[in-house]
Amino acid sequence: VGCGTGLSLALLRAAVGEQGRIYGFDQSPDMLAQARQRADAAGWRNVELFECPAQSLSLPTPVDAILLHYTHDILRSPLAIDRLLAVAEHGAAVAIAGVKYFPRWLAPLNLWVYLKNHGYNGSPGELTAPWDRIAPHLSDWQIAPTQFGMGYLAFGRVNKSARGKK
């Protein structure tokens, strides 16, 4: 999700092998061009890349895993979340990495987090719990802080009730 320049493609390709499929999408044609160049140079025939915003995502087959890597605006969009859940199989793994505000005891540093992220995020004021719109649709939800509390890693599985919002 929001594959950018395709930096994660090599690791994803190693995980799924030649028989698996990788779908990547990004709404930035420049970023996607770099991802395409990376996949083409490596000869990965099982990597398909789509230029579209998450809110209009449509894939040829359901997916069994979703990776959201620093995609704050997608996590803040109910329509984007609905589209992601609609293309996911029941029980699909969802892994998320992102930025959030520091814990209260480091609150003065949140101005720095805000200033660092406001140019990249449409809703930087919503960095307290950026996962709060997708988490209710996931089971086995786990979250761990990173970067002294400024970042997070999260994991869950798509609930059966979350599917079917096409």
Regions found by a protein language model. Give the residues of each.
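Class I SAM-dependent methyltransferase SAM/SAH-binding core
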Residues: 1, 5-55
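Helix-to-beta-strand junctions that scaffold the AdoMet/dcAdoMet cofactor pocket
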Residues: 17, 75-76, 88-89
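A short acidic, Gly/Pro-enriched loop at the edge of an enzyme's catalytic core
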Residues: 56-66
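A short, conserved alpha-helix within the catalytic core of class I
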Residues: 74-84
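Conserved beta-strand signature within the Rossmann-like core of class I S-adenosyl-L-methionine
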Residues: 91-99
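Conserved Class I S-adenosyl-L-methionine
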Residues: 108-126
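Short alpha-helix
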Residues: 121-137
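Core SAM-dependent methyltransferase catalytic element
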Residues: 139-166
